[in-house]
């Protein structure tokens, strides 16, 4: 990114880039650019599992509300990019598990994180993730994540932790490795 990224708004960007995480359940995440906190990432996961978009819920779980969430919250203290709020919305997760359980070859097992009907809510808090798709290959659950933007230096560490837990949750619920 530093060498090949183009100046785009207030950052550097690369477009149409993909990568594979070979062992997503290994949550020993390191980042030389910042200190990563597994304790905080776990609290964020518990917040997502609560299905509650309120930053106050995160504060209850973690003991404080990180400044980034205060900045992103709407006037009611809700965060629209809370993955738990999004994946459980409209029974999406149940639908995905049902599709995978009934047909391991399904191409319908997808979660929508970004909801176009919520564009007005996204003024200060637009989800970076658009969608998550699940496929089964050799009885193993694979997951593909599609992002509109990826804060590789700061956000990705926590996102990877959350994504691995989403994959683990869906695998357990649908009976795949």
Write out the residue ranges for each language-model feature.
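Terminal, non-catalytic protein-protein interaction segments that mediate quaternary/complex assembly
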Residues: 1-177
């Amino acid at each position: 990114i530093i060498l090949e990224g183009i100046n785009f708004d207030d950052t550097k960007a690369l477009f149409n880039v993909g990568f594979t995480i070979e062992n997503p359940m290994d949550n020993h995440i390191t980042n030389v650019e910042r200190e990563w906190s597994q304790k905080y990432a776990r609290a964020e996961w518990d917040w997502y599992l609560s299905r509650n978009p309120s930053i106050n819920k995160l504060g209850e779980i973690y003991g404080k509300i990180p400044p980034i969430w205060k900045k992103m919250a709407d006037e009611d203290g809700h965060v629209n990019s809370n993955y738990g709020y999004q994946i459980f919305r409209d029974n999406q997760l149940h639908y995905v598990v049902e599709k995978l359980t009934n047909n391991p070859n399904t191409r319908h097992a997808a979660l929508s994180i970004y909801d176009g009907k919520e564009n007005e809510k996204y003024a200060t808090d637009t989800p970076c993730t658009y969608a998550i798709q699940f496929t089964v290959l050799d009885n193993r659950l694979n997951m593909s994540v599609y992002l509109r933007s990826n804060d590789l230096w700061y956000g990705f560490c926590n996102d990877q932790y959350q994504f691995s837990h989403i994959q683990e949750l869906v695998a357990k619920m649908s009976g795949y490795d």
